[in-house]
Amino acid sequence: MPLIPWPASADDSSKGKDDEKDIATKAKELFALAGEIPPEYFSVAAFAAGSLSLAASYFVHKRYFRRIPNAEWVSPNHLARKRWIKGRVTSVGDNDNFRFYHTPGIGWRWPLKFRRVPTLTKELKDQTIHVRIAGVDAPENAHFGRPAQPYAQEALAYLRARILGKTVFCQLIRRDQYGRMVSHVRLAPRFLPATLFRGPNLAEDMLRKGWATTYEQHGAEYGEGGVERYKQIEQEAKDARRGIWAKGVRGETPAEYKRRYAQAADGGEPPSKARAEKEQKRGWLQRLFSWK
């Protein structure tokens, strides 16, 4: 049952007037105390407030808006904190690394687009970060006079289709011997806001599709699930005969390929020639069943 709005009594009215008088009296007392404060104190307080505001603005700009042009600008503090940075992939030249343009803060997308990612090669010079995807090893392309591994072109095509021209998030881990930033890479979520959520783990995607193997050499870095998760995903791709495992699991891995050429560099017969002669001596039936 609703309460009946009885009219205010005379006592309530007088009490409200007394409260107003008390407030007015206290306000006068505060103004009087403020008048006794020396003017220089106000100057110090204003200077302190301005300094605090300036420091806060600098921190926000440094943390959220200042761009990292290239790997040389990545500081030890970034690596110690394993900082996540956002950027647009501008080129994919190899099967397990790429270059991306750091895009911090706002202004890169509509409706608040007032900054742009360069597209010309001369504009991108020294303005991109070279990223090595952590935890995986992909088939080697032909370079330095070495032949490409089987499925190298297919692995490169997959990676380009997956990330080229797209936004990714990189967690900076360390700088490798080639000056690349070893990083955990996540794609932007498809439907959820990228500022609050991150998408799939790129390394796990590569393993799942069969276009990479788990990197197990010195300095290997893995995601939250550790090496066990990576090996499990790789095994699932092997069982399903995906990607580089389409013809079996006994092919030469990227790690074995690089080890073979490293040993050959120390002396001896070129590994490609020795391997070709060995293959010729084997019968076609033996080569066929060796992939199982």
Swiss-Prot record:
Q: Where in the cell is it found?
A: Mitochondrion; Membrane
Q: Which residues form the active site?
A: 132, 140, 180
The UniProt keyword set, sorted, is:
Calcium, Endonuclease, Hydrolase, Membrane, Metal-binding, Mitochondrion, Nuclease, Transmembrane, Transmembrane helix
Primary residence = mitochondrion
Its record classes its membrane topology as: Single-pass membrane protein
Question: Which Enzyme Commission number(s) are listed?
Answer: 3.1.-.-
Q: Which Gene3D superfamilies match?
A: 2.40.50.90
Binding positions for Ca(2+) per the UniProt entry: 137
Name any one Pfam family assigned in the record: SNase
Q: Where is the composition biased (Basic and acidic residues)?
A: 272-282
Q: Which domain of life is it from?
A: Eukaryota
Membrane-traversing stretches: 41-58
Annotated region (Disordered) at 256-282
Note the InterPro entries from the entry.
SNase_OB-fold_sf, Staphylococal_nuclease_OB-fold
- Domain TNase-like spans what residues? 83-247
GO CC, alphabetical: membrane; mitochondrion
Alphabetized GO MF terms: endonuclease activity; metal ion binding
Question: Would you identify the family this protein belongs to, as annotated?
Answer: Belongs to the LCL3 family.
The name under which this protein is listed is: Probable endonuclease LCL3
Source organism (scientific name) = Schizophyllum commune (strain H4-8 / FGSC 9210) (Split gill fungus)
